[in-house]
């Protein structure tokens, strides 16, 4: 009986110790990073920053929501080449989206593709990917607002040859508004 109690105590203690080490490592790794230091680290390491194509499929999106999304992409602090491909997937409210498209059509980083009819999100993404030429492709939903350093952070992660894909942490803007989002 004493052997069983001792073994159990050792197992519980070991688990507690290993869990503490693991959680500490997670907390340390998850500390916010300074985006300018990420770019400086990449540049000092002689890394040529890859070109990034951001694809934004949209369908019947609210014009203000789409405008906020595109503004957040336009304001990225990424030092490399950034292109944005917006695919309107046959929206019925194109007359309302026209002014948003017009604003960004004059920005050489932006390309607007107007699909003749709704073909679905996946096919809209495929249309954007086929017209992309970037080293990396970032897919962004049309109702997403990116922090200014998102592209820089994702590119930094993609410099590791063992990494094949990277994604950001999503934070719902309405997370405190309703019981569904709390």
From Swiss-Prot:
GO terms for biological process: extracellular matrix assembly; hyaluronan biosynthetic process. It is an enzyme of class 2 (transferase). Keywords: Cell membrane, Glycosyltransferase, Membrane, Nodulation, Transferase. Its EC number is 2.4.1.-. The keyword Glycosyltransferase applies. It holds the Pfam family Glycos_transf_2. It is a peripheral membrane protein. Coiled coil: none annotated. One of its GO terms (cellular component) is plasma membrane. One of its GO terms (molecular function) is hyaluronan synthase activity. It is found in: Cell membrane. CDD domains: CESA_like. Involved in the synthesis of Nod factor, a sulfated N-acyl-beta-1,4-tetrasaccharide of N-acetylglucosamine which initiates a series of events in the host plant species leading eventually to nodulation. Belongs to the NodC/HAS family. This is N-acetylglucosaminyltransferase. It comes from Bradyrhizobium elkanii. The gene is nodC.
